[in-house]
Each structure stands twice: as structure tokens, then as C-alpha cells.
Regions:
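Sec-dependent N-terminal signal peptides of Gram-positive bacterial secreted proteins and lipoproteins
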Residues: 2-25
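Nuclease and nuclease-like effector domains acting on nucleic acids or nucleotide cofactors
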Residues: 28, 33-289, 297-326
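Accessible peptide chain termini
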Residues: 1-2, 208
């Protein structure tokens, strides 16, 4: 039987969501002005199937050969460095506008005689000051495989785009009684610096009498500060814009006397331009701060694209606190 690969990349964000309204209008008009999303866990699933109608068959169908072939395939995914480039992300003036990825539903496998689905998660926990990757057998349908080789390696970089170096290898082999739904492993890293992080996962599954095959997926970069706190994802539901991300994780501090100034005139000019561009949201602007995506402290400027309006409590209690640990 030929092993058929069907790679399902399911991005699941476990989010703490707070919706803030702040205009002096009615309650209905205040709601949904801004959405603050704080990702905690990012998950992907990989599903490998074996088709009962497959025509190809391994000439060495004993378990030892299947396991050996699976290990060889797993070793081919060993990369000390990976390169990331998102053609839809707009990077300009030290900030990156990253398009929001919509959640995709997992596809069914009506012709699959047997399948195994693996769950790969990356957990950012600022309380433990850790970043953890996990590997878990999510489901098994039909005959269980005799071997599963799985890995969920962590990579980091100082830039959103470009080369990422491996932080650690997290590889696991499932054999015999370990091949059961719910069996999982985890590995943690305790960052000391702000970085962009990516995880790359690989699954190799082999059934008796089949040729093992492999499936690989990579999670898009996520910016986390030195305590593992993910950069907040905030959407302005009036302008339909999501707050950009700083393009680097290692911007140096600019001396106070060298920083660009921010005055009440600059603030007024921004508000006028915002209304001209997006229309009047009828907000109580006195209750808002205008946030610099790249702060003046790190070389940010007063250009329109580097500015983002925020309720004062979010600006001071979320963004400023995040940057305190940059």
C-alpha cells in the first residue's frame, strides 16, 4: 500500500479577547471599536493517511524496515537554519504590516483506511517566562501506525524576514504502546532577549506494509519579548487596520536628546489626517493616546504609518508594559 500524505495546517489561536468602546455615544456605538487579542497558544495539525486502494507497496514490509525508513526520512528534516519570507507582508520604515491569517477548517479523509493526526503547539507564557513546543498524538483512525517520528523545533531571529537559527531540537519517536491518542511531550526555552520566533514541525508515519512518508509545516514568525510575552495583536475595527509589528527585535535605545519630538500639534495633525483618511469615528479623542508602533525611544518617527490610536488603558497597561521588557 502506498502511504498518501495529506498535510493539514490548522492554525488555532487561543486568545484572550477584550473589546473596548470609548466614544461618548450610545453603548451600541461604543462597542467593537477596538479588539485586543493576546495569543497564548498556537497550534498546527498534521494528518498522514494510508489509502486502502493504494497500488504501491514496500518490498521490505517488515516492521524493522519501516521503522528504519521512517528514521531516515525524519533525519532529512534536520535544519540548523531556515529562511522566512512573506510576500504579502509589507515592510517599510522599520515596521511590518502582517496580513491576518484566517482559521482554516480541517479537511475530512473519506477514502483513508487509516490515519494519524498530530498536534504541534507553541506556547508563549510570560508568567513562566518560557516558550514551549509540544508534540501530541491528536487522533488515530483505523489501524495505528507502527512508528511515528515527530519533531517541533524552535527557531529565532532578530528580523521578521530572513534567516532564523535553531534554538533547540525537539524530536520524539513513538513506538509500540506509546502510539496512543493523547500521548504528548513538551520542551521549554527561557528567553533572555526579544526575538522573532518560528517553529517547524515534521511528521513521519509508517504502517506495516507501507512506504513511510513525511509532512512538514512552519508557523509564521511571532515577536516575543525577553519574558516570552507575545507582541499584542490589536485591530482597529473602525479603520479595519491591525497594528503593525516592529521589523526588528534589537532596535537600540536612542539617546533622549536625539529622539524625534512629539507635540500636541503633532497629535492634532494625526487626528485630522486620520479623520480625512478613514472618516470621523466620533470618538472622544481626549480618552485616547496615539501610540508609536516603533517608540521614539527606539528610533521611531511621527510618520502616519507609525502611529496607531489606542484607549489610554491599553496603551499604558499593555503596550508600554510590553516594551518595558523589550
Amino acid at each position: 500500500m502506498k502511504l498518501l500524505k495529506n498535510s493539514i495546517c490548522l492554525l488555532v489561536l487561543t486568545l484572550l479577547i477584550a473589546t473596548i468602546g470609548f466614544s461618548p455615544q450610545t453603548k451600541a456605538s461604543q462597542e467593537n471599536s477596538f479588539g485586543l487579542e493576546k495569543p497564548v497558544t498556537i497550534e498546527e495539525k498534521e494528518t498522514l493517511t494510508v489509502d486502502k486502494n493504494g497500488v504501491a507497496k514496500s518490498t521490505n514490509d517488515d516492521q524493522a524496515s519501516v521503522i528504519k525508513n521512517a528514521r531516515q526520512l525524519a533525519n532529512q528534516s534536520d535544519h540548523n537554519e531556515i529562511t522566512y519570507k512573506n510576500p504579502t507582508a509589507k515592510e517599510e520604515n522599520n515596521i511590518v504590516n502582517v496580513p491576518v491569517v484566517e482559521k482554516k477548517d480541517e479537511k475530512a479523509h473519506p477514502k483513508a483506511a487509516s490515519l494519524v493526526s498530530m498536534s504541534y503547539t507553541t506556547i508563549y507564557d510570560p508568567n513562566k517566562k518560557s516558550i514551549t513546543t509540544t508534540i501530541k498524538i491528536a487522533s488515530i483512525v483505523g489501524e495505528k501506525p507502527i512508528v511515528i517520528e515527530a519533531r517541533n523545533d524552535l527557531y529565532d531571529s532578530n528580523t521578521y524576514s530572513g534567516k532564523y537559527g535553531r534554538v533547540f531540537v525537539h524530536s520524539r519517536e513513538f513506538l509500540g504502546k506509546d502510539i496512543k491518542v493523547g500521548k504528548s511531550y513538551s520542551k521549554s526555552y527561557y528567553p533572555k532577549k526579544t526575538k522573532f520566533y518560528m517553529s517547524q514541525h515534521t511528521t513521519v508515519a509508517g504502517w506495516k506494509g507501507s512506504v513511510p512518508d513525511t509532512s512538514t509545516g512552519t508557523l509564521a514568525p511571532a515577536l516575543a519579548n525577553k519574558i516570552g510575552w507575545l507582541y499584542p495583536e490589536i485591530k482597529n475595527n473602525h479603520s479595519k487596520k491591525t497594528m503593525p509589528v516592529p521589523a526588528k527585535a534589537n532596535f537600540p535605545v536612542v539617546p533622549a536628546d536625539k529622539r524625534e519630538e512629539w507635540t500636541s500639534t503633532d497629535r492634532g495633525n494625526y487626528i485630522k489626517k486620520y479623520i480625512d483618511k478613514y472618516g470621523n469615528p466620533k470618538w472622544n479623542w481626549s480618552a485616547l493616546d496615539v501610540h508609536h508602533v516603533l517608540p521614539l525611544k527606539y528610533g521611531g518617527k511621527n510618520n502616519f504609518d507609525n502611529l496607531f490610536p489606542l484607549p489610554r488603558d491599553i496603551h499604558q497597561n499593555v503596550l508600554n508594559r510590553w516594551w518595558d521588557k523589550y
